[in-house]
């Protein structure tokens, strides 16, 4: 969608900052343990585990740390059993928000998620209220658009669904289960992406064209991401170029 890469840049900067504090590492390790526990410990046979390992590597988690988390998940420790719950709601300006959590205390989690919404003029919705606006898929991006022909040839041959060119970057779209295969094919061809992830991509966008509302949306998303039980926060917000310029000052 329009503005996708710009919002993604904000998220990735925050992810790198959080990784320094260790918060992202903690959340990713939790997800690796869960993925390994619920599926095959071999990432080549477990698309979910493969996707979260890619996420771990993108924030410079070591292979040793990743392997220990996988081993923990396959060890069957009941202390690692957690509920995976998604919450849905709206922020100011009709921005749809999908919050993925892993928790050992549902009451605590829903209370903290609801507080983040209401404190920032948002509302926690019911199950199904916004989930239909998002599609789970793999996204592999390249900042060098001159690679379009090479990327298209390799990616489509590997089963990618589409390649988008917005004039500034290339976005390879895959089925989430096929994400690892397409990424491997691109890497084997010497086409190393600038970012790659399995995400929940919005089918529509909510336009925010003033800084005040944009700051409220970002504050709400920051509050949600800072909740220990929250794994991922997805939204369909799209900031205008003018708003983006002011936010990045």
Curated annotation (Swiss-Prot):
Gene3D superfamilies in the cross-refs: 1.10.10.200, 3.30.70.980
Family statement: Belongs to the TACO1 family.
Gene Ontology terms: cellular component: cytosol
Cross-referenced Pfam families: TACO1_YebC_N (PF20772), Transcrip_reg (PF01709)
Organism (species): Psychrobacter arcticus (strain DSM 17307 / VKM B-2377 / 273-4)
Gene Ontology biological-process annotations: regulation of DNA-templated transcription
Keywords: Cytoplasm, DNA-binding, Transcription, Transcription regulation
Domain of life: Bacteria
Protein name (Swiss-Prot/TrEMBL): Probable transcriptional regulatory protein Psyc_0938
InterPro entries: Integrase-like_N, TACO1_YebC-like_2nd/3rd_dom, TACO1_YebC_N, Transcrip_reg_TACO1-like, Transcrip_reg_TACO1-like_dom3, YebC-like
GO molecular function, one term: DNA binding
Main location: cytoplasm
Compartments, as annotated in UniProt: Cytoplasm
């Amino acid at each position: 969608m329009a503005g996708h890469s710009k919002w993604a840049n904000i998220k990735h900067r925050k992810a790198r900052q959080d990784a320094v504090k260790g918060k992202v590492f903690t959340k990713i390790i939790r997800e690796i343990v869960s993925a390994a526990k619920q599926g095959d410990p071999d990432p080549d046979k477990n698309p979910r585990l493969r996707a979260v390992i890619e996420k771990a590597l993108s924030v410079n988690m070591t292979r040793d740390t990743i392997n220990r988390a996988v081993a923990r998940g396959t060890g069957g420790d009941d202390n690692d059993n957690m509920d995976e719950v998604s919450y849905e709601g709206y922020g100011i300006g009709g921005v749809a928000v999908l919050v993925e959590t892993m928790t050992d205390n549902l009451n605590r989690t829903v209370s903290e998620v609801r507080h983040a919404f209401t404190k920032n003029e948002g509302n926690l919705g019911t199950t199904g209220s916004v989930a239909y606006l998002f599609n789970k898929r793999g996204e592999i991006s390249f900042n060098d658009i001159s690679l379009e022909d090479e990327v298209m040839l390799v990616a489509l041959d590997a089963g990618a669904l589409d390649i988008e060119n917005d004039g500034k970057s290339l976005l390879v779209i895959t089925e989430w289960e096929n994400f690892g295969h397409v990424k491997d094919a691109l890497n084997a061809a010497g086409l190393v992406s600038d970012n790659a992830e399995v995400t929940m991509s919005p089918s529509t966008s909510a336009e925010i064209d003033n800084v005040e509302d944009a700051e409220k949306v970002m504050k709400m998303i920051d509050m949600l991401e800072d909740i220990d039980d929250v794994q991922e926060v997805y939204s369909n917000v799209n900031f205008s170029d003018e708003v983006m310029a002011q936010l990045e000052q």
